[in-house]
């Protein structure tokens, strides 16, 4: 093999090793995103909800900016309740399917059922509320006290 080819191969291997340090999203969050898209019938990507209002996304505080943000607050509270029962919501995967009428949970274990129910309720709530682009990526430090 030509030395230049070896250098290119080495560079690719090193960059792949570096990329392996990037943590993936917990599988449950991927499932939750798919469940949201099922419930809202793909009207918008689930990622649009990641930084919405005071509660949609990581953490949450203050008063929800609207009813959609309130869906996220209730979801956070549901996850907190699951943790009190010994579950790890962000790591718990569950079995569900997207049916004609929307998401349907068919998990078996207590934690899977609990977490799926939290995600199901939030996804259905998202489907019933309006998305206001003005509430996306707000300054939570100022707005969510």
UniProtKB/Swiss-Prot annotation:
<dbReference type="GO" id="GO:0005543">
    <property type="term" value="F:phospholipid binding"/>
</dbReference>
<keyword id="KW-1015">Disulfide bond</keyword>
<feature type="signal peptide">
    <location>
        <begin position="1"/>
        <end position="27"/>
    </location>
</feature>
<protein>
    <recommendedName>
        <fullName>Neutral phospholipase A2 homolog taipoxin beta chain 1</fullName>
    </recommendedName>
</protein>
<dbReference type="GO" id="GO:0050482">
    <property type="term" value="P:arachidonate secretion"/>
</dbReference>
<dbReference type="GO" id="GO:0005509">
    <property type="term" value="F:calcium ion binding"/>
</dbReference>
<dbReference type="InterPro" id="IPR033113">
    <property type="entry name" value="PLipase_A2_His_AS"/>
</dbReference>
<feature type="disulfide bond">
    <location>
        <begin position="87"/>
        <end position="111"/>
    </location>
</feature>
<comment type="similarity">
    <text>Belongs to the phospholipase A2 family. Group I subfamily. D49 sub-subfamily.</text>
</comment>
<dbReference type="GO" id="GO:0005576">
    <property type="term" value="C:extracellular region"/>
</dbReference>
<dbReference type="GO" id="GO:0006644">
    <property type="term" value="P:phospholipid metabolic process"/>
</dbReference>
<feature type="disulfide bond">
    <location>
        <begin position="78"/>
        <end position="118"/>
    </location>
</feature>
<feature type="disulfide bond">
    <location>
        <begin position="71"/>
        <end position="125"/>
    </location>
</feature>
<comment type="subunit">
    <text>Heterotrimer of alpha, beta, and gamma chains; non-covalently linked.</text>
</comment>
<feature type="disulfide bond">
    <location>
        <begin position="105"/>
        <end position="116"/>
    </location>
</feature>
<dbReference type="InterPro" id="IPR033112">
    <property type="entry name" value="PLipase_A2_Asp_AS"/>
</dbReference>
<feature type="disulfide bond">
    <location>
        <begin position="56"/>
        <end position="72"/>
    </location>
</feature>
<comment type="function">
    <text>Monomer (beta chain): Snake venom phospholipase A2 homolog that is neither toxic nor enzymatically active. Does not bind calcium.</text>
</comment>
<feature type="disulfide bond">
    <location>
        <begin position="54"/>
        <end position="144"/>
    </location>
</feature>
<dbReference type="InterPro" id="IPR016090">
    <property type="entry name" value="PLipase_A2_dom"/>
</dbReference>
<feature type="disulfide bond">
    <location>
        <begin position="38"/>
        <end position="98"/>
    </location>
</feature>
<keyword id="KW-0964">Secreted</keyword>
<dbReference type="InterPro" id="IPR001211">
    <property type="entry name" value="PLipase_A2"/>
</dbReference>
<comment type="function">
    <text>Heterotrimer: Snake venom phospholipase A2 (PLA2) heterotrimer that acts as a potent presynaptic neurotoxin by blocking synaptic transmission and synaptic vesicle recycling. May act by binding in a calcium-dependent fashion to neurotonal pentraxin-1 (NPTX1) and neurotonal pentraxin-2 (NPTX2), but not to neuronal pentraxin receptor (NPTXR). Also binds to taipoxin-associated calcium binding protein 49 (RCN2), a protein localized in the lumen of endoplasmic reticulum.</text>
</comment>
<dbReference type="Pfam" id="PF00068">
    <property type="entry name" value="Phospholip_A2_1"/>
</dbReference>
<keyword id="KW-0732">Signal</keyword>
<dbReference type="InterPro" id="IPR036444">
    <property type="entry name" value="PLipase_A2_dom_sf"/>
</dbReference>
<dbReference type="GO" id="GO:0047498">
    <property type="term" value="F:calcium-dependent phospholipase A2 activity"/>
</dbReference>
<dbReference type="GO" id="GO:0016042">
    <property type="term" value="P:lipid catabolic process"/>
</dbReference>
């Amino acid at each position: 093999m030509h030395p230049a080819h070896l250098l290119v191969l080495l560079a690719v291997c090193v960059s792949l090793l570096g990329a392996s340090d990037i943590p993936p999203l917990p599988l449950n969050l991927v499932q939750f995103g798919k469940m949201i898209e099922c419930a809202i019938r793909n009207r918008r990507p689930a990622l649009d909800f990641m930084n919405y209002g005071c509660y949609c996304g990581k953490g949450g505080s203050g008063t929800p900016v609207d009813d959609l943000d309130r869906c996220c607050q209730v979801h956070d509270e549901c996850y907190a309740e699951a943790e009190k029962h010994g579950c790890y919501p962000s790591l718990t995967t569950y079995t569900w399917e997207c049916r004609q009428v929307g998401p349907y949970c068919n998990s078996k274990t207590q934690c899977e059922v609990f977490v799926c129910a939290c995600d199901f309720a939030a996804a259905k709530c998202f489907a019933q509320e309006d998305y206001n682009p003005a509430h996306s990526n707000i300054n939570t430090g100022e707005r969510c006290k």
